[in-house]
UniProtKB/Swiss-Prot annotation:
A GO cellular component annotation in the UniProt record: cytosolic large ribosomal subunit
Similarity comment: Belongs to the universal ribosomal protein uL15 family.
Pfam families from the UniProt entry: Ribosomal_L27A
Region (Disordered): 1-43
The protein's name: Large ribosomal subunit protein uL15
Subunit structure: Part of the 50S ribosomal subunit.
Molecular functions (GO terms): rRNA binding; structural constituent of ribosome
Alphabetized NCBIfam families for the sequence: rplO_bact (TIGR01071)
PROSITE patterns: RIBOSOMAL_L15
Organism encoding this protein: Rhodopseudomonas palustris (strain TIE-1)
Length: 161
């Protein structure tokens, strides 16, 4: 037996069917695409169409809604604040508010307000003004000798403030 004499078992590799090669081949004329029309052409994909079967997006029930009045807060953790103080981006002597956080590069933008979260350690004494804070965050700031003032959420434009 030589390497050049090795062959596959009979029927283990089936040749692919070449379509559109005459009606005698059994896959000629329309080439398995049915009649004429949009789906007989190349590049056709009807999004969500599953061959007449009820598509998934219609089988599943509708659920929930989007509240147009929901407020979206930018979130800041204590460890991120401590990093900013350590790198001198935030002055510990001044009031830390949304504008100061954006200016320091801690936040990209303040959205509808800022919410303080309690992840990490805070050793700097900071006076913080935010629109929301967790109990653990408030406790950590006060333990470090600082204070947290909770502001009212930003009023909607056109609303009397």
């Amino acid at each position: 037996m030589k390497l050049s004499e090795i062959a596959d078992n009979v029927g283990s590799r089936k040749k692919r069917m070449r379509i559109g090669r005459g009606i005698g081949s059994g896959k000629g004329k329309t080439g398995g695409r049915g009649g004429k029309g949009q789906t007989a052409r190349s590049g056709v994909r009807i999004k969500g169409f599953e061959g007449g079967q009820m598509p998934l997006h219609r089988r599943l029930p509708k659920r929930g809604f989007n509240n147009i009045f929901a407020l979206e807060f930018a979130e800041v953790n204590l460890d991120r604040l401590q990093e900013a103080v350590d790198s001198k981006a935030i002055d510990a002597g001044k009031v830390v508010d949304a504008a100061a956080l954006v200016e320091a590069g801690v936040l990209r933008r303040a959205k509808d307000g800022v919410r303080l979260l309690g992840r990490g350690e805070l050793t700097a004494k900071l006076n913080i003004e935010v629109h929301g804070a967790t109990k653990s965050a408030i406790a950590a700031v006060e333990k470090a000798g600082g204070s947290v003032k909770i502001l009212a959420p930003k009023a909607e434009e056109g609303e009397a403030a």
